[in-house]
């Protein structure tokens, strides 16, 4: 049976798949951000801490606007103190202090908001922003494979994001969760995860891993990519919860900083937790004698 392309659902699907109006701005801003991220990661130290700090400032403001639109300034100040404090501790290589600071800020939020929902929103924002940022700096400072870890994260997440975007746009198909994000499709998830797996395999090859370890990179690339895509979906849930379309309009074609690096934040949590609390995870990736 031929599909009915005249119905409202089909027409909407065609509009979504054919809307490339923001592609130029999306590519240009993405290239600028990617270049800044790679350069900062390469130099590490205070350079990367400064970039992470700038991102934390922007994300804290975006979260404050979403969660407390009638009290942006005090919300921003609290979130900034929590998340930026975690970044500072992590830049001094005190990851445990960073986590402890976030816990203290979460407890302090009870004094300010006084309701369970308010505490969850404020404390959750500080942790959601500060935890991945601190882990990201910690991952970079790990010797001797810190830079390789960050570059692999970039490669996997960027490949996944790009192919998920184009795969979903071109192929369309069934939606994942229309109530959360009306444009995300299973085809995008599949193409994004596949691209992330291949990017992971490529990283294993570039890092001179043996054939067996390249298979590990392939599998972990898929896991990291899928985690990043779920982080993107979770960000959509948060925006729906707060009743906004984008976290902000800071980045042309992407929305806000939270919109742009949600996948990277989720992947950083996964990789950081695995390497911090699972010693075998490091051997699994870098056991080939890097």
Description of each model-found segment:
Residues 275-290:
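Juxtamembrane boundary at the C-terminal end of a transmembrane helix
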Residues 241-264:
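Interfacial loop-to-transmembrane junctions
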Residues 27, 63, 162, 233-236, ...:
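Generic detector of well-ordered alpha-helical packing
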Residues 159-169, 227-238:
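Short helical (or helix-break) motifs at transmembrane helix termini and adjacent helical loops
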Residues 169-170, 239-242, 265, 269:
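Re-entrant/interfacial helical elements at transmembrane boundaries that shape
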Residues 2-222:
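Membrane-embedded alpha-helical bundles of polytopic integral membrane proteins
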Residues 260-277:
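Final/C-terminal transmembrane alpha-helix of multipass membrane proteins
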